[in-house]
């Protein structure tokens, strides 16, 4: 880990605008990362007296701790997943909750983490929390072909999931898949020439699938969507930034269903996406989508 802060937060102005008329005093950032959004919120809203920032990535927390030193006394950082945050959070605690889903550019550029195609000789890890859990390498070397194929299909929506799973199992009979290069070699004959000519790397969906499975991102997102409204005070707002349809779809439907139940209203009737200027400066932002839900002011009789 370096002392620099390479991660550029996305949709910052748009995220701030969703809380502009609210003047929040308590805020929860469940993916604080390197502290980019936190810095923007704490600077823009002097009204925030208590900002809880959590993340599964200890390296990111170390960076955010340095970045947020000017706001000492207003910030509390903790190493926690969504389910752990839920266990710690009482009802009606926050005016706002923010989640920035997916992998960060900081994690991608740290080749030791195994998230990037570029780190060929680096271990195929992919854990956001390197202190626990199984690695992508362990998944590929231990699960049955059918299980690996299901991961590629369900979490990557990879059209060639059967062929890719078969290639992995065939390769590991001769050599364990331990590095990024091993996975590339294992699947080298899977993709047709038109996939190889595209700008998007042919292994993109496979990497996505492994990352989501290793980090149980779907289960963690479900915890967030099932619980975050409970954390909010009446009139509080939940903003979620997603980067792929597997994340955005559940968010969209959860917000719609909560609105239908009378729990509040969707503030982003049209999903918010980055401007051309932002995507030019930060290409990673191009697939970002921001949605926001406001909890009802009405207090339940239950």
Swiss-Prot record:
It catalyses: cytidine(1402) in 16S rRNA + S-adenosyl-L-methionine = N(4)-methylcytidine(1402) in 16S rRNA + S-adenosyl-L-homocysteine + H(+). It is found in: Cytoplasm. Keywords: Cytoplasm, Methyltransferase, rRNA processing, S-adenosyl-L-methionine, Transferase. GO terms for molecular function: rRNA (cytosine-N4-)-methyltransferase activity. One of its GO terms (cellular component) is cytoplasm. InterPro entries: RsmH (IPR002903), SAM-dep_MeTrfase_MraW_recog (IPR023397), SAM-dependent_MTases_sf (IPR029063). This is Ribosomal RNA small subunit methyltransferase H. The gene is rsmH.
């Amino acid at each position: 880990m370096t002392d620099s802060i390479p991660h550029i937060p996305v949709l910052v102005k748009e995220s701030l605008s969703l809380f502009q008329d609210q003047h929040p005093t308590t805020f929860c950032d469940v993916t604080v990362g390197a502290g980019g959004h936190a810095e923007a919120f704490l600077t823009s809203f002097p009204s925030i007296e208590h900002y809880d920032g959590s993340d599964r990535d200890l390296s990111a927390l170390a960076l955010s701790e340095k970045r947020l030193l000017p706001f000492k006394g207003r910030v509390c950082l903790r190493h926690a997943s969504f389910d752990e945050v839920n266990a710690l959070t009482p009802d009606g605690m926050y005016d706002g909750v923010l989640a920035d889903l997916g992998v960060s550019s900081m994690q991608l550029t740290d080749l030791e983490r195994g998230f990037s195609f570029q780190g060929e000789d680096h271990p195929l890890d992919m854990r956001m929390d390197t202190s626990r859990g199984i690695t992508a390498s362990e998944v590929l070397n231990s699960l049955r072909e059918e299980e690996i194929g299901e991961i590629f299909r369900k979490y990557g929506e990879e059209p060639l999931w059967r062929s890719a799973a078969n290639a992995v199992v065939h390769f590991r009979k001769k050599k364990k898949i331990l590095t990024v290069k091993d996975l590339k070699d294992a699947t080298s004959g899977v993709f047709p020439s038109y996939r190889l000519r595209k700008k998007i790397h042919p292994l993109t969906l496979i990497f996505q699938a492994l990352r989501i499975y290793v980090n149980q991102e779907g289960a963690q997102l479900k915890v967030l969507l099932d619980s975050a409204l409970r954390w909010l005070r009446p009139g509080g707002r939940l903003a979620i930034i997603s980067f792929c349809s597997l994340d955005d779809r559940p968010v969209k439907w959860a917000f719609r269903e909560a609105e239908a139940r009378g729990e509040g209203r969707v503030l982003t009737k049209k999903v918010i996406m980055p401007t051309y200027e932002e995507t030019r400066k930060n290409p990673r932002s191009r697939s970002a989508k921001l949605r926001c839900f406001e909890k009802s002011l009405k207090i339940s009789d239950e």
